[in-house]
A protein has these predicted regions:
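Positively charged n-region of N-terminal signal peptides that target proteins for export
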Residues: 1-4
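Bacterial N-terminal signal peptides
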Residues: 6-21
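Extended terminal
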Residues: 25, 494, 517-518, 545-663
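Structural boundary/hinge residues at secondary-structure and domain interfaces
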Residues: 25-178, 222-280, 300-416, 433-446, ...
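Intrinsic, low-complexity N-terminal interaction/targeting segments
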Residues: 93-97, 101-108, 164, 251-254, ...
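A conserved glycine-rich beta-strand in the N-terminal activation segment of trypsin-fold
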Residues: 176-255, 495-588, 595-598
Length: 663
């Protein structure tokens, strides 16, 4: 249910090949490091320090071998043709692939998403072509030819280090109605490509000495790279990246407005109003084929406390951002009831009690009406027809600070195969159980059942996901107060939306935890696990990943996770292959439908990627390994590191229990 490193690297490389960048090795290249060239208005930046070395390292990994597997060739060619025929916006219309750009890279290859004076994002690709001059000239010719095929009009050609600019008509498949511009130049041994000719002129002018007001001069950039960059050797051809989250999101919105105006809140604006602009920057480094790791990454989210605030105080930020409290703990390994053969496991330390209080302003802002959150909490307590529960005292105060997420799937793969279980630590499990029973027993849509000797409550009707206990935290395209004067109708819509998330949910209290499962079968498996050899903690592949994480991130941690990439990616792979991804009932499928759909309720989007040429999953399973991630909370943010281990380093495949969906 999550996107693993395999998906990010393998599939993402295919779909975004024309913008995947690389960066500079050392100062001997055709220009200074790109972070000294791109301006301080850069909102997103990626660099690979040495293109040829990066290419060799990537090709040696399981991801590189996967892309070179003959069985994948039809799918890869299909994706490339789809990209070429899509006439995609921005630089996509140049028809460049990742191989095209890496072929001309003799040093750094970098990409910048830069906010222009208009508030929109402009894209710049910068490649050091030292030693690859002939290939670079050939690529320039290819781009000129592509522009002619796209019916582009050359509007400016300068002498010397010429900057070539083409005006392009709206693409047939882009959904855009305005013309676009694409510009490129070969200045010495620097290839510069972008969609803003004025910005490219500035970049070309700074290739010699760089600029003072560069992205590298930003304090947040310095803090992020200072934490992460020294974690890898300079010879590793590392991928370095940086993003200024909210400004990037705001500029992206301005650059890519929806085709149709949709009702609902502006989440980017809301996050800014609610104090989440306290996150000043995020970034890090990624290396491939690194001493036994297929992939290793180090990330820093830089969020220093506001001036005059204490780093360990819940008041370090303003308003809803105060919920960003993830206390470190000594041991957050998998509990004895986590089954040995699950696809993925994550444990997170989270100050739930603080979040319950601080989320108030965020909920009200999303709904567009002050007091909605308090009204919901009060109605649960005071409504004579309700459960009459004090959520804060009877539930939240009885829960601890640890949350666990388990993901898995049933076979054969179908639109309802994915499984999810959330476990919240209970410091007073008896009181939590009493609260759950009081709430569920009066709800006609919940059936009292027995699961491994424990009282549980199963949803038998799709009227709501987790009745009464589910505090209404609306998400997605939520009706807003400005667009719906009928409060009851609006809140009914919110409940109907929540219903879709866990339509078969089961709730119980056992093993000192409140369990919320997407389906009864995953809860049965968890409660039947007796520890020792049945538990995830005893699996050798988990132990190997945990050992590496402990070495890279020793001490207390706020998060730990483990993923078996093959099992994690398999449901999405099979659904993509069947052409059924838009029908998926999983959370992942619903999120994709929300992002890629037309925003109209009840409609099923068309799958945009043709997966019919994908090989049988068993033919490519061997390329997927295991992955782990850990996070530590710091006084000025959060530090995250993770690894992916190739299958060759693992024990024989963990035998999965034969799990089939209930009839």
């Amino acid at each position: 249910m999550r996107i693993t490193a395999a998906v990010t690297v393998a599939v993402g490389t295919l779909l975004s090949s024309f913008v995947v960048p690389t960066g500079v090795a050392e100062a001997a290249g055709a220009f200074p490091p790109s972070e000294k060239i791109f301006p301080a208005s850069t909102r997103g930046w990626v660099s690979i320090s040495h293109g040829p070395e990066f290419r060799q390292r990537f090709n040696r990994t399981q991801y590189g071998l996967l892309l070179k597997d003959p069985s994948m060739k039809p799918f890869i060619e299909s994706v490339r043709k789809q990209i070429e025929n899509s006439n995609g916006g921005r630089l996509g219309r140049l028809g460049l692939t990742l191989d095209d750009l890496l072929e001309v890279a003799g040093g750094e290859y970098a990409l910048g998403a830069i906010e222009s004076p208009t508030g929109k994002l402009a894209t710049v690709v910068l490649v050091d072509t030292t030693g690859r001059e002939a290939e670079a000239r050939s690529l320039i010719e290819k781009m000129n030819q592509r522009m002619v095929e796209q019916k582009g009009t050359k509007v400016a050609v300068n002498g010397g280090d010429s900057l070539t600019v083409y005006q392009l008509p709206p693409g047939e498949n882009t959904g855009r109605t305005t013309e676009q511009r694409v510009a490129f130049a070969l200045s010495g041994n620097a290839l510069v490509v972008g969609d803003d000719s004025a910005l490219l002129t500035q970049v070309i002018g700074t290739l010699g000495q760089g600029r003072g007001d560069c992205v590298g001069s930003l304090p947040a950039f310095g803090e992020v790279m200072g934490r992460c960059q020294n974690q890898v050797p300079t010879s590793a051809a590392a991928v370095r990246w940086y993003v200024d989250p909210l400004p990037f999101a705001k500029a992206y919105q301005a650059t890519n407005p929806p085709r149709e105006k949709r009702k609902g809140p502006d989440y980017v604006a809301i996050l800014g109003r609610q104090g989440f602009d306290a996150v000043k920057g995020a970034g890090g480094v990624v290396v491939f084929d690194d001493g036994g790791h297929a992939l290793r990454h180090h990330t820093m989210v830089y969020a220093p406390p506001l001036e005059g605030r204490q780093p360990d105080s819940v008041e370090r930020f303003n308003l809803a951002a105060r919920m960003l409290q993830f206390p470190n703990a000594e041991d957050i390994g998998p509990q004895q009831w986590v089954p040995r053969d699950v696809s993925g496991w994550t444990s997170l330390q989270f100050d739930l009690r603080n979040a319950f209080v601080t989320v108030e302003s965020l909920v009200d802002d999303i709904v567009g009406e002050k007091g909605v959150y308090d009204d919901v909490i009060a109605s649960v307590k005071e409504d004579p027809d309700g459960p009459q529960i004090d959520l804060e005292k009877d539930l939240v105060a009885c829960l601890g600070s640890r949350a666990t997420l388990i993901t898995d799937h049933t076979t054969p793969i179908g639109d309802d195969s994915e499984r999810l279980l959330i476990a919240l630590e209970a410091v007073d499990p008896e009181r939590v159980a009493a609260t759950v029973a009081k709430s569920m027993s009066i709800d006609p849509d919940m059936a009292k059942i027995d699961v491994q000797g424990n009282v549980a409550w199963e949803l038998i009707d799709r009227s709501m996901a987790i009745p009464q206990l589910e505090v209404e935290l609306p998400g997605g395209a939520v009706p807003h107060a400005d667009h719906d004067e009928d409060t009851h109708r609006r809140r009914t819509k919110l409940r109907e939306r929540e219903e879709k998330l866990l339509p078969h949910s089961v709730v119980t209290v056992a093993q000192g935890h409140l369990f919320i499962a997407s389906h009864r079968d995953i809860l049965e498996r968890v409660l039947a696990t007796k520890g020792d050899v049945e538990a995830l903690g005893s699996a050798m592949d988990y132990t190997q990943v945990a050992t590496e994480l402990n070495r890279l991130l020793p001490g207390k941690a706020a998060t730990r996770s483990f993923t078996r990439e093959d099992e994690a990616i398999r449901p999405a792979y099979e659904m993509l292959r069947q052409g059924s991804m838009p029908k998926s009932k999983s959370l992942t499928g619903q999120v994709l439908n929300g992002i890629l759909g037309d925003g109209k309720p009840g409609t099923v989007r068309t799958q945009r990627l043709d997966g019919s040429t994908l090989p049988d999953f068993e033919m490519v399973r061997r390329y997927f390994g295991t992955a782990g991630v850990g996070m530590q909370s710091l006084p000025d943010g959060w530090y995250i590191t993770g690894v992916t281990l190739p299958r060759s380093q693992q024990e024989p495949e963990v035998a999965r229990r034969p799990v089939t969906p209930p009839q």
